[in-house]
Amino acid sequence: MGEFRRYFELDKFLQQDFLYPLIFHEYIYALAHDHVLNRFILVDNFGYDNKSSSLMVKRLITRMSQQNPLLISANDSNXKKWLGHNKNLYSQMISEGFTVIGEIPFSLRLVSSVERKEEIGKSHNLRSIHSLFPFLEDNFVHLNYVSDILIPYPIHLEIVVQTLRSWLKDASSLHLLRFLLYEYQNWNSLIIPTPKKPSSIVSKRNQRLFLFLYNSYVCEYESIFFFLCNQSSHLPSTSSETLFERTFFHGKIKALVEVGSNDFPPVRWLFKDPFMHYVRYQGKSILASKSTPLLMDKWKYYLVNFWQCHLYVWSKPVRIHMNQLSNHSFGFLGYLSSVRLNPSVVRSQMLE
């Protein structure tokens, strides 16, 4: 039991008080010259330009600390002010610095994964670092029911902060994130849907920060699905070598099953061989299985309770639609048509 319980303990590396001191440290620019990060994609990544570099953030903070917040120039009277400064510029710059440093744990985990595997395709987009790639199998003939789960569920700002608390214990950093989210104008409308504007987690001016928050949210949301795929003896994973997040969350879910089964024995039989298939395509989680409608309905309510009680991810059963795969296979067909499959050459020799 102790072996399973240890997975509930957060990784010590992920619990370091790293974020807030680094942002306001005098020598934050040293991050831009770090050897480990430079040899990967943090510096050369698309979108990581001079506007969001650690050096620029350091200079910005130094400039803010030297200025008098009560002095407002007459030329800037029409500009929006935040603590006496240009709100749009300064809050955006600090949010960029927050994101750059917040991505360090994910990047370092990628570095350690590469050192073990020695070979990995170079990523040109930071979104893929902490976004779990969908599980894929080519054969769907054995599946008969599919559940569509619309994601992301409209996220409240506090739920976003609570999600980050699972791997970041630095209270100062969480307060800074909460301050940025609530102080920046119209950020609530980007996360909480309004009648005039649909829900969206991505901001054009602060896309990097919102992608980081969104992927952290989805990473928690999807953890249970990859556990189910690995549990199924009929659906071995075909693309799990470089997905270091899967190992981390798989340990957590496995421990939860072992510990929770003592208090809730009926839960254990759900995990024996779920025979499930999961993909994420166009904002939906598609979960297919060779099961009866009753079993799929049980899974629907179990997943909702699991997300709400253990991952602080709020969802509702009405957002999960169950259909027969024969009448609802368009999502799978569209997903497969957009994925480039690597054909393998098989050589055969006839025996005389």
Swiss-Prot record:
It is found in: Plastid, Chloroplast. Keywords: Chloroplast, mRNA processing, Plastid, RNA-binding, tRNA processing. GO terms for cellular component: chloroplast. It holds the Pfam family MatK_N. GO terms for biological process: mRNA processing; tRNA processing. Coiled coil: none annotated. The keyword Plastid applies. One of its GO terms (molecular function) is RNA binding. Belongs to the intron maturase 2 family. MatK subfamily. Usually encoded in the trnK tRNA gene intron. Probably assists in splicing its own and other chloroplast group II introns. This is Maturase K. It comes from Saxifraga cernua. The lineage of its organism: Eukaryota, Viridiplantae, Streptophyta, Embryophyta, Tracheophyta. The gene is matK.
